[in-house]
């Protein structure tokens, strides 16, 4: 598993966005599809240039019984945080896995176009979107 790190890149702007969210007092959850155990998810977090401690919580197959794109996945996260959907923002790069289900759960969304996954070539114009710089601006103005 650790050899997969060679295929994963880092974007220092990801750390900047996470830090800005934390500085603003937002809880930050890594809502990754929970197909790995915690030890593997923690490795993947580090491969991205972040630390598990950067997150309030992150999903793994040990701690959540739903996966994307089920809206119940997002509802479980909201319950775990004690948060209301209208107060939360889901940032994702996968049109199918991240955007629709999160919106169905009542969350606001931002489509990160860096490493965009759009398997079916869906129209993405309805979503607020952009690269990490645009995301930083969106986060700073969001509330």
Q: Residue spans of the language-model regions?
A:
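Short, acidic loop-to-helix structural element flanking the phosphoryl-transfer center
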Residues: 1-29
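Asp-based, Mg2+/Mn2+-dependent phosphohydrolase catalytic module
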Residues: 15, 19-20, 31-36, 41-143
């Amino acid at each position: 598993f650790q050899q997969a790190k060679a295929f994963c890149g880092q974007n220092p702007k990801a750390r900047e966005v996470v830090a800005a969210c934390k500085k603003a007092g937002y809880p930050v959850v890594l809502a990754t599809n929970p197909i790995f155990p915690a030890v593997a998810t923690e490795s993947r977090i580090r491969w991205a240039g972040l630390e598990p401690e950067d997150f309030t919580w992150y999903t793994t197959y040990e701690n959540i019984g739903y996966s994307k794109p089920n809206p119940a996945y997002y509802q479980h996260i909201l319950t775990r945080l004690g948060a209301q959907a209208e107060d939360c923002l889901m940032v994702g790069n996968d049109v199918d896995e991240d955007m629709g289900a999160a919106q169905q759960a009542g969350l606001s969304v931002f489509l990160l176009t860096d490493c965009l996954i759009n398997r079916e070539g869906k129209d993405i114009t309805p979503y607020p979107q952009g690269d990490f710089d645009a995301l930083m601006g969106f986060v700073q103005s969001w509330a």
